[in-house]
Regions:
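Single conserved hydrophobic/aromatic residue that forms the stacking wall/gate
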Residues: 2-13, 337-345
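Structured mid-domain segments that build the active-site/substrate or prosthetic-cofactor binding neighborhood
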Residues: 11-159, 163-167, 273-276, 284-307
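Short glycine/threonine-rich loop-to-helix capping motif typified by GTGT followed
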Residues: 133-136, 172-174, 210-224, 311-313
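Short secondary-structure subsegments characteristic of cysteine-rich extracellular domains
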Residues: 173-192, 345
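Catalytic alpha/beta core of large soluble enzyme barrels
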Residues: 212-214, 220-306
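Short cysteine-rich clusters marking metal-coordination/redox-active sites
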Residues: 306, 319-322
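Cys/His-rich microdomains that often coordinate metals
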Residues: 310-314, 323-326
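Short Cys/His-rich "knuckle" micro-motifs
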Residues: 315-318, 328-331
Length: 345
């Protein structure tokens, strides 16, 4: 982390493409500024809701500190927002009535999961539940693990906000976004109510949907067919992100996605993909800008190079210089690296 705006980044930005702001705006930075506690992302984007040492979900007094180390998330169930809107229209029902039904359904699933897991014995994982691996994990082998679960979060996942907006009025998140923002505010309000009523640490998670993005399209097409900008591609957009086909600058992408940033505190990331031959000074500037805005920022890179002549391009299937198909392709997306190499004979 870079605590001083005047401090140089050196070459760290080349080695660490994920950046977490502790001094900018928003939830994660506010916890660090007030308590000196870092909410480290789990996996590529998940963040824990605060649990206070004395007060639990809420601080018992001003000095009551949150605990993040040793805690975990028990799972996420994701909404299919475009399909919910399509269903409401087909049945001539209010969209928010249908949305609330599915929010309630996810709520019941989470309650059931807490109850089911709570009946398990600490002997299923002694390191976690008996020897302190998890926060509060000092149970006897025969104890049920329910007391440990009170600090665990359960998430309501969000995908395809771009496709939701497109279905609503034919405009993308770049062109509009007001309806998608209204929906996110409604979901936050309802989940906050569930949280207080149930005493469970529910969170809202911007689902990456690596596999779900394809499943949701197939589900939508089976019911409602192919709609331009909604289901005409083999995938839906990741969480609240602008569609990958949008012709926008990295700064525009940061600003557009910032609208939803504080409405997905259970899991989120903002990222930009750079071509080879990138402007390193521009990347430094964008990282600093992201830190000022309070982002968890990812720098995505791609590279294809010819193993025969050494030619490099962002993407290629055949080398334009020598005609070789003997290529190595590297894709670095968020915290995931994929390397594709030719078959050696």
């Amino acid at each position: 982390r870079d605590r001083s705006p005047s401090r140089g980044l050196g070459d760290v930005y080349k080695r660490q493409p994920d950046w977490l702001s502790l001094t900018g705006k928003g939830y994660v930075a506010s916890m660090y500024k007030k308590y000196g506690k870092i909410i480290s992302p789990m996996g590529c984007r998940a963040f824990l809701s605060p649990w206070y040492e004395q007060g639990g979900m809420h601080p018992a007094f001003d000095g009551d500190e949150p605990v993040f180390v040793g805690r975990f998330n028990i799972g996420v169930v994701s909404l299919h927002l475009p399909m919910i809107l399509a269903k409401a229209r087909k049945e001539s029902r209010d969209f928010y009535e249908v949305l609330d039904y599915y929010l309630e359904l996810i709520r019941r699933l989470h309650i059931r999961t807490y109850a089911y897991l709570g009946e398990m014995r600490a002997s299923t994982n002694p390191l976690a539940y008996c020897e302190g691996g998890f926060y509060g994990g000092h149970l006897k082998l025969t104890d049920k693990i329910k007391p440990v679960l009170k600090t665990a979060t359960a998430s309501f996942g969000i995908t395809a906000l771009n496709e939701l907006q497109m279905l609503y009025n034919g405009k993308s998140l770049v062109e509009d976004g007001a309806f998608a923002l209204e929906v996110m505010e409604h979901i936050n309000k309802r989940v906050d109510e569930f949280k207080e009523e149930d005493g469970n640490l529910y969170a809202i998670y911007g689902t990456p949907a690596e596999n779900l993005c394809g499943l949701q399209i197939r589900q939508f097409r089976e019911q409602y067919g192919i709609i331009e900008g909604v289901s005409d591609r083999p995938y839906v957009s990741n969480s609240f992100h602008c569609h990958v086909s949008e012709d926008i600058t990295p700064i525009q992408k940061q600003d557009l996605e910032n609208r939803f940033w504080n409405l997905s505190n259970g899991g989120k990331i903002q990222y930009v993909k750079y071509p080879i031959g990138y402007n390193t000074l521009a990347i430094k500037s964008l990282i600093r800008r992201a830190m000022d805005m309070g982002f968890y920022e990812g720098v995505n890179l791609s590279l294809s190079y010819c193993d025969d002549c050494g030619h490099e391009e962002l993407q290629m299937d055949v080398c334009p210089k020598c005609g070789s198909k003997n290529l190595t392709k590297i894709d670095r997306m968020l915290s995931l690296i994929h390397i594709s190499e030719p078959t050696r004979r």
